Amino acid sequence: MSAEQIAGTGVIHGRFQPLHLGHLEYLLAGAERCRTLVVGITNPDPWTTTEETTDPERGLPESNPCTFYERYLMVEGALTEAGVSHERLRIVPFPHSFPERLAHYAPADARYFVTVYDDWGDAKLDRFHALGLRTEVMWRRTDKPVSGGRVRRSIAEGQPWEHLVPPAVARVVKECGIDERIRA
């Protein structure tokens, strides 16, 4: 990628319930495209989580076992462990269920990086376009090799799961008792 194609500030977002290797691929692809990466954590609390018709399970309490702070630790740990310096990284709440609020959390003049796997990805892209945000679709795919649901199910069923997440995330899950919470 040439210097002219690198954004000054890029915004990328995810629920990270928990952050897995698919998320890490996405986050690192975003980091390659900008000098400063703003990572928005969606559904930051139960009061900024609404039902999404294109993905109804994403708002359920059992789909959101990790707090904002725990996910902050996951994002920070995974990205710095992968070589992204703290100086380039900003982590913010990102209540995309309320698009009119996003300008209060992330810069409107940044480039917003997205990936599209399904109707939910297209719905988010439409929301960003409606807000007049500059977007870049990094890829469109139909197959997700790993998902947060798969990680949560593996933990709940007592199956191996650490291979699905970066080492820093496995540490946060264990240290914060997220694995015990999911199994309860």
From Swiss-Prot:
It holds the Pfam family CTP_transf_like. One of its GO terms (molecular function) is nucleotidyltransferase activity. GO terms for biological process: antibiotic biosynthetic process. Catalyzes the displacement of the beta- and gamma-phosphates of CTP by phosphonoformate to produce CMP-5'-phosphonoformate, an intermediate in the biosynthesis of phosphinothricin tripeptide (PTT), also known as bialaphos (BA), a natural-product antibiotic and potent herbicide. Its EC number is 2.7.7.93. Gene3D superfamilies: HUPs. This is Phosphonoformate cytidylyltransferase. The gene is phpF. It comes from the Bacteria. The keyword Nucleotidyltransferase applies. Keywords: Antibiotic biosynthesis, Nucleotidyltransferase, Transferase. It catalyses: phosphonoformate + CTP = CMP-5'-phosphonoformate + diphosphate. Pathway: Secondary metabolite biosynthesis; bialaphos biosynthesis.
